[in-house]
């Protein structure tokens, strides 16, 4: 089992004008990540899981809808997934 750790900003980002479909997909994404880890996320084509580059190198991204993304980092030696941001497709750092 993988541990999911959310950044403190994520609650604030999700409490705004986020569609309920995106919230449901985010919860399902967390369930899959908790059980199967990054390999399980990559196996599901609907998430379009991919590695990021540039200043986000070392992070990964999964789609929660056409516009919404979850950006996360994997710490493999402790089976930890750190969720950095849930955003409306804006990869710039806050």
What are these model-predicted stretches?
Residues 1-68, 74-94:
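Basic, Lys/Arg-enriched alpha-helical interface segments
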């Amino acid at each position: 089992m993988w541990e999911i750790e959310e950044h403190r900003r994520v609650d604030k980002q999700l409490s705004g004008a986020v569609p309920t479909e995106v919230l449901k997909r985010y919860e399902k994404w967390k369930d899959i990540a908790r059980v199967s880890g990054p390999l399980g996320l990559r196996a599901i084509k609907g998430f379009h899981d991919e590695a990021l580059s540039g200043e986000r190198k070392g992070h990964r991204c999964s789609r929660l809808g056409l516009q919404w993304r979850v950006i996360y980092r994997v710490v493999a030696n402790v089976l930890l997934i750190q969720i950095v941001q849930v955003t409306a497709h804006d990869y710039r750092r806050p």
